[in-house]
């Protein structure tokens, strides 16, 4: 008989931490903690295979599942001494999701399941605390109705708020047993009104309703969005964990909390977290109440007057500190823990590798290696390359004036400025218009995830460091300030009030997620300083990677940034980007308007010294590192004005005839410029353009070599080659110019001539082309366009639908399509190296900074990747991980 249920508890478990794919992260963690003898409430896991079966069979379950669940539930009752549905000593359970990848808050949870009108009386009698029993029952009705019955929780919040207002109460803890009992009746009536049916009283019906709801939540919109943002496959499914309830809401000797074994924002090695006395777990993570600090040191640092867990519950605190040491040593990583204290007894509800900022990830990885818990190679694999992006963006200038409006909790580091928006939909809409926004909410919920993704930063008035906003923002690398209680939001009026000032949607704010400050208006930012653990981990990564990492740089500023980030050369210098300066664009336009070759050469002569200076600066900055310069690539019409007014203005500035300029612009118009008169085709028809650029390169190389005494070996790249004959023709012009400059300067010139492989024909004919080309650089942007027959500039209108419908697993312009484009690259490398065995091969499209694409480049045997300057550290780390066999496989 197939096994559909895995039990844990009482010092043993049927699963292990290695069974994460089957049991999900939560189930595997609970099983492992139980096996380690840690205090875990007994329970069982329904594995991800059941979720897969559920969706493949019209929301039906395997035939044996109900019998196995009943048996496992009976075993939980045996261990606890309780019975499910019993009216004397009832067993209550929680039902939680648990995917193999952490998806905080994205799926559904139900607590206190098993309560009904009879068992609530039994719970009251057994506990001797009627208030606790009815508080638990009203929580269950709220969660079950929201998750299973589709009755939104705001209905119950309104009933509660009205009752508190009428009774003169401020806090939930002010309510008495009689209050909760009355509210339970009102809640049940609301369910009857909304659904037309009474609230379910049969515990087994409740259980299967909750199990079905958790499986269904795998396909809710917020979970789908989260999976898309974090590249989590839909096919993985979720497990369901059913576990005996332990209660943190049994008075002042009970509590619930979340802790990390190291600080998830900074990586500092000390217990970090929050707890709430007389509460249940959802109160902490939902951010509805602002929690208390766990340690005395943290309480003093925060300036809180509320007691810490260390002071209020010293025995439970001591046990927690012991357990966190056990778990970190066992898992050899920072752990995120959930716990409940029931009448001074600590229970562990979850352990998992904790989400952390890039800054924390670097520090934790390096310190774990230095402590001997992991190797340096393991440390290199512990940091997500894409997360380094968090470290490479502006922070607030220390010299900037800070007009502090309020201070909350520093929930996710970094700083951001933007216009205030009060809803996730507004944030997404304004982002689409190119505007930067700060999402301001009382608290965020999983429904806000699309707006959080669109926002530059997040600001909440409630919630702590482990609230939904904090956890999700850290995972996204977004600055976040939470729990800024001095702020007052009026959603209906669209205003934010603080210290007597009223701000409207569209006003500018700055949030500093490193200090918790909310600042007035726009504030100056500075670039980050990278050192310490960053430098250490990067040096370890450089020690294991095989691929070189170059940069795409067109200006001295780009080149300097790239060198600072560890670039080993320039893999793509786009010479056309040097032509758009006001002085230069006029000379380019004169060249385009010229009636004959002589006039064109006269215009190009004006550009020669400018290009020579550009190249000389790059050669000097790169200090002997390779520099690959692409000859002019875009079609000429891109340099001409558009529209009558612009044409008249440009003609006046040039002293040219507006009609001639307009006629020339019309004459250069193309129906499909991506496949038109561009690239090497310009050099074939107008060889004088390539000659001018080659002369500028060689004169600059000779000048820098003479002044510095260091060899300069430029790599000249001819774009959009489809045939060897094209390359032969252009290379002959380049070689002739090299000989001329060599004769004029009397010095030696060493250079390489290669080509971009960006057309399928070029990849297929790579063996022949390599007879002339001394290196290949795969231009994966255009190769993707020409392989798919998709214009990158026009793809946004439909590519989203393709990824949503799983026609393409990822956007092929973001992550390389291995099966199609990747196969052409493999063919090109193999055939090229058959002709020229030491052929140097790289890529220089946007994919050069994508970790999954870099993993492919490692597998395909390329020599280097080239990416934008700010992605160089990402590429260095991704290349190291690829060499260690941990690259991200991604397919389209």
Model-derived segments and their meaning:
Residues 44, 461-463, 482-485, 573, ...:
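Short beta->alpha connector loops at strand-helix junctions that form conserved
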Residues 372, 519-537:
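Short, compositionally biased
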Residues 1-403, 410, 429, 435-438, ...:
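Nucleotide/phosphate-binding sheet-loop regions of phosphoryl- and nucleotidyl-transfer enzymes
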Residues 508-514, 740-741:
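A glycine-rich helix N-cap at a beta->alpha junction
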Residues 345-347, 445-453, 457, 467-471, ...:
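Glycine-rich phosphate/ribose-binding loops and adjacent secondary-structure elements
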Residues 423, 486-487, 534-538, 554-556:
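Intrinsically disordered, low-complexity regulatory segments
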């Amino acid at each position: 008989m197939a096994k559909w249920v895995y039990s844990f508890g009482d010092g043993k478990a049927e699963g292990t931490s290695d069974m994460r794919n089957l049991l999900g992260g939560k189930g595997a963690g609970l099983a492992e903690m139980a096996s380690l003898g840690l205090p875990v409430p007994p329970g069982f896991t329904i594995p991800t295979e059941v979720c897969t079966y559920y969706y493949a069979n019209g929301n039906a379950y395997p035939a044996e599942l109900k019998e196995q669940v009943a048996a496992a539930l009976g075993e939980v009752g045996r261990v606890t001494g309780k019975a499910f549905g019993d009216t004397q000593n009832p067993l209550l359970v929680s039902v939680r999701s648990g995917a193999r990848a952490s998806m905080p808050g994205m799926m559904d949870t139900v607590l206190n399941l098993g309560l009904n009108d009879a068992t609530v009386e039994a719970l009251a009698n057994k506990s001797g605390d009627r208030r606790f029993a009815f508080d638990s029952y009203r929580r269950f009705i709220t969660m079950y109705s929201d998750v299973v019955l589709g009755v939104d929780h705001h209905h119950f919040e309104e009933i509660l708020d009205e009752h508190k207002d009428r009774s003169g109460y401020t806090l939930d803890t002010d309510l008495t047993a009689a209050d909760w009992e009355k509210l339970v009746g009102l809640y049940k009536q609301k369910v009857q009104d909304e659904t037309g049916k009474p609230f379910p009283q049969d515990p087994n019906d409740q259980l299967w309703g909750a199990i079905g709801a958790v499986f269904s939540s795998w396909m809710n919109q917020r979970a789908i969005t989260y999976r898309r943002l974090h590249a989590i496959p839909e096919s993985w499914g979720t497990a369901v964990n059913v576990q005996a309830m332990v209660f943190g809401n049994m008075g002042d000797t009970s509590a619930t909390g979340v802790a990390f074994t190291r600080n998830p924002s900074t990586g500092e090695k000390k217990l970090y977290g929050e707890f709430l006395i007389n509460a249940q777990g959802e109160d902490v993570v939902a951010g509805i109440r602002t929690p208390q600090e766990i340690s005395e040191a943290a309480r003093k640092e925060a300036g809180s007057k509320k007691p810490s867990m260390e002071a209020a519950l010293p025995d439970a605190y001591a046990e927690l500190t012991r357990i966190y040491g056990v778990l970190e040593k066992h898992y050899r990583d920072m752990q995120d823990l959930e716990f409940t204290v029931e009448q001074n007894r600590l229970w562990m509800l979850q352990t998992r590798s904790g989400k952390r900022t890039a800054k924390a990830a670097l520090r934790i990885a390096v310190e774990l290696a230095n402590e001997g818990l992991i190797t340096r190679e393991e440390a290199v694999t512990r940091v997500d390359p894409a997360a380094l992006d968090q470290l490479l963006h502006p922070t607030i200038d220390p010299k900037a004036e800070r007009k502090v409006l309020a201070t909350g909790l520093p929930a996710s580091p970094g700083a951001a400025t933007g216009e205030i928006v009060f809803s996730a939909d507004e944030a997404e809409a304004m982002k689409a218009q190119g505007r930067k926004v700060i999402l301001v909410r009382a608290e965020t919920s999983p429904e806000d995830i699309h707006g959080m993704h669109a926002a530059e930063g997040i600001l909440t008035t409630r919630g702590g460091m482990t609230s939904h906003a904090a956890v999700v923002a850290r995972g996204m690398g977004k600055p976040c300030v939470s729990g800024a209680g001095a702020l007052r939001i009026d959603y209906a009026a669209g205003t934010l009030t603080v210290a007597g000032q009223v701000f409207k949607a569209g006003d500018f704010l700055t949030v500093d997620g490193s200090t918790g400050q909310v600042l007035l208006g726009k504030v100056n930012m500075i670039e980050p300083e990278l050192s310490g653990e960053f430098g250490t981990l990067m040096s370890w990564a450089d020690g294991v990677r095989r691929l070189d990492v170059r940069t795409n740089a067109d200006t001295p500023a780009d080149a300097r940034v790239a060198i600072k980030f560890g670039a080993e050369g320039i893999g793509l210098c786009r010479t056309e980007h040097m032509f758009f300066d006001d002085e230069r664009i006029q000379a380019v336009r004169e060249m385009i308007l010229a009636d004959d070759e002589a006039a064109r050469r006269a215009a190009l002569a004006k550009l020669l010294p400018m290009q020579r200076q550009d190249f000389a600066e790059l050669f000097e900055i790169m200090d002997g590192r390779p520099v690959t310069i692409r000859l002019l690539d875009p079609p000429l019409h891109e340099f001409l004005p558009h529209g009558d007014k612009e044409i008249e203005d440009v003609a006046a500035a040039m002293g040219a005839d507006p009609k001639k300029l307009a006629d020339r612009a019309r004459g250069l118009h193309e129906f499909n410029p991506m496949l038109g008169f561009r690239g090497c085709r310009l050099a074939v028809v107008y060889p004088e353009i390539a000659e001018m650029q080659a002369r500028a390169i060689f004169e600059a190389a000779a000048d820098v070599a003479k002044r510095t005494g260091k060899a300069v070996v430029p790599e000249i790249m001819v774009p959009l080659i489809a045939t060897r004959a094209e390359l032969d023709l252009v290379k002959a012009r380049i070689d002739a110019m090299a000989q001329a400059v060599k004769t004029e300067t009397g010095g030696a010139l060493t250079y390489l001539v290669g080509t971009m492989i960006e057309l399928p024909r070029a990849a297929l004919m790579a063996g022949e082309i390599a007879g002339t080309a001394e290196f290949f650089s795969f231009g994966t942007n255009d190769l993707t366009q020409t392989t798919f027959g998709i214009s990158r500039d026009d793809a946004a209108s439909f590519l989203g639908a393709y990824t949503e419908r799983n026609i393409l697993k990822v956007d092929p312009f973001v992550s390389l399509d291995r099966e199609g484009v990747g196969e052409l690259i493999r063919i090109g490398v193999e055939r090229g190296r058959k002709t020229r065995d030491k052929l140097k091969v790289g890529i220089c499209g946007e994919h050069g900074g994508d970790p999954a694409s870099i993993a492919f480049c490692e597998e395909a045997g390329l020599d280097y990747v080239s990416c934008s300057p700010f992605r160089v550290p990402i590429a260095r780390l991704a290349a190291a991980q690829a060499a260690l066999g941990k690259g991200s496989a991604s397919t389209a």
